[in-house]
Amino acid sequence: MHKKKIIFSDNTLWAIFNFRGNVIKHFTDKGYEVIVIAPEMEESEMQGSVPDGIRLIQVKMERAKTNPFSDIAYFFRVLRIYHKEKPVYIFHYTIKPNIYGSIAAKLNGVRSSAMMAGLGYAFKNDSLVSKIARGLYKIGMKCTENLFLLNKENLSDILRLKICNPKKITLLKGGEGVDLKHFGYTDNSSDDITFLFIGRILFEKGYNEFVECAKQIKKEYANVRFEILGTLDPTYPNSVSKERLEEDVQSGTICYAGFVKDVRPIYARKGIVVTLPSFYGEGLNRSLMEACATGKPIITTDIAGCRETVEDGINGYCIPPKDSNALIEAVRKYMNLTDEQRKKMSEASRMLAEKRFDIDNVIDIYDRII
């Protein structure tokens, strides 16, 4: 007897397993054959990326560029894949799978869901490209059964722009969730403090504000460092250049730890404060949720997708976006806390994660849909 198939389609292989690994394992444990569709990549990039028992289908796709001919070709590729595989359900993530994958699923008579993990470039301005993208999104969302959103502001924007029928929308209040056993609480007490930026290295993630803060704080305190963990993304329009990053590292302002697949050893270090002064269109920031789960204090901005991870003055500080001075002041506040006050912040982060971000709550929603 053939197993029923479920497809997960995203624009990066890493995101599928990093954000939805527990959901995928849950369905394989239930006896489904799970197929993952992701863009073509080098063999060296794939090593260790795909767990045993998961089938990967690579598809040619321009992840970030807007090219109608390339996008049409991508649409027909996934249309053929869905026709051949005949899955019982498809989960789409990110803009191109959400649009073209949802249409392809509908044409094949396959039930599907889409997830918008933050509103990207298509919703930031009124350029012709953005208007076309929003129009395509409306078509795609007519073809899908469910649309997952991760915060209330995104929900308001989607309703205001009439992108999707409200009856189809599910708000995941705890984002995509965190495995609270995998990301366990660790003692954070230390006299030496590291303010850690985790994420794609984009100006919109608050890179300039982070660097400006580092320059000032390092003049005032000796036992402090500012570290960045993440990747450069040259495909993104507002990405920090390799040259700029190297310049800030060589000046001694920041340290760069590169990219790691497993961040737990980083979180296991003592004296970590996860600091993300983002003004990017977040869904619900994964790194901040993981930081909460491991008991790290948070400094982040009062924007959708970030503010949900911090209770100001309780487990960290919530500051205005695009405000280096506010970030500097928040860092000063943390540096001047007593050991006991820092410990209470760490404990409060873990409590917040247990209250809001448990992955089991998300898995229950996936189960109800299928």
Predicted regions mapped to residue ranges:
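Glycosyltransferase donor-sugar binding loop
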Residues: I37-E43, I198, R225-V240
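Short hydrophobic beta-strand element within catalytic cores of glycosyltransferases
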Residues: V274-T275, P297-T300
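A short, well-ordered alpha-helix in the C-terminal region of glycosyltransferases
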Residues: A326, K333, E340-K355, I365-R368
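A conserved mid-protein helix/loop that constitutes part of the nucleotide-sugar donor-binding site
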Residues: F17-N22, I193, L202-Q216, N325, ...
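Short His-centered aromatic/hydrophobic patch
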Residues: H92-N98, M116
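Nucleotide-activated donor-binding/catalytic signature segment of Leloir-type glycosyltransferases, i.e.
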Residues: G230, S239-F259
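Donor nucleotide-sugar binding/catalytic pocket of nucleotide-sugar-dependent glycosyltransferases
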Residues: I57, K138, K142-Y185
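Conserved acidic donor-binding segment of nucleotide-sugar-dependent glycosyltransferases
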Residues: D312-G313, Y317-N325, K333-D339
